[in-house]
């Protein structure tokens, strides 16, 4: 058995994850051909892959719907593997018309459980990020979501 693994080098953890999987599966006789390329999109487009490992921010604005609409639905632009779930599509219809944050959170839990039950996605790592700034930068604080480091408190003296 050979698994064709596609990833890219611009996120430091992705090549390391590929190498770890490759070494671990080799121990049980499974070969993993790793293709780590900045041109990963060409490989995805060709369909000549079995596993695509990519990094993304699941909830950049704190709203749980983002991940599902970008990655998990029939019309999602990043649904690389062509995943489909009637249940998930129905839950998303409900999510679209639900505005209460507690209810949206409950729907998000159901949606998450659906993709986990289907083994549609494997969440394998978490990015370790360092923030470095030039001398004189003040008010820069790390935040779990990419968009919230730039605040009214950020300044350069």
Language model features with spans:
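Extracytoplasmic/secreted cell-surface and envelope-processing proteins
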Residues: 13-16, 43-44, 61-64, 133-135
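Solvent-exposed, polar/charged alpha-helical surfaces in well-ordered, non-transmembrane soluble domains
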Residues: 16-19, 23-27, 42, 86-93, ...
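Bilobed periplasmic-binding protein-like "clamshell/Venus-flytrap" ligand-binding domains
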Residues: 1-9, 55, 99-134
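Short, solvent-exposed loop/beta-turn-alpha elements that line the ligand-binding surface or hinge
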Residues: 43-48, 68-97, 126-157
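Alpha-helix N-cap/loop-to-helix boundary motif
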Residues: 13, 36, 56, 80-84
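Periplasmic binding protein-like
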Residues: 5, 23-72, 108
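Append "and occasionally in soluble cytosolic enzymes with long acidic Gly/Pro-rich linkers
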Residues: 1-23, 27, 35, 110, ...
């Amino acid at each position: 058995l050979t698994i064709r693994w596609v990833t890219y080098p611009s996120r430091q953890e992705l090549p390391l994850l590929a190498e770890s999987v490759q070494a671990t599966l080799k121990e049980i006789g499974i070969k993993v051909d790793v293709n780590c390329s900045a041109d990963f999109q060409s490989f995805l487009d060709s369909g000549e892959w079995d596993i695509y490992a990519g990094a993304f921010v699941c909830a950049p604005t704190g709203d749980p719907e983002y991940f599902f609409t970008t990655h998990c639905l029939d019309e999602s632009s990043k649904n690389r593997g062509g995943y489909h779930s009637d249940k998930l599509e129905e839950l998303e219809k409900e999510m679209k018309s639900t505005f209460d944050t507690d209810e949206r959170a409950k729907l998000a839990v159901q949606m998450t459980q659906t993709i986990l039950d289907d083994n549609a996605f494997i969440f394998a790592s978490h990015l370790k990020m360092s923030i470095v700034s030039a001398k004189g930068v003040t008010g820069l604080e790390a935040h779990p979501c990419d968009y919230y480091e730039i605040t009214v408190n950020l300044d350069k003296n």
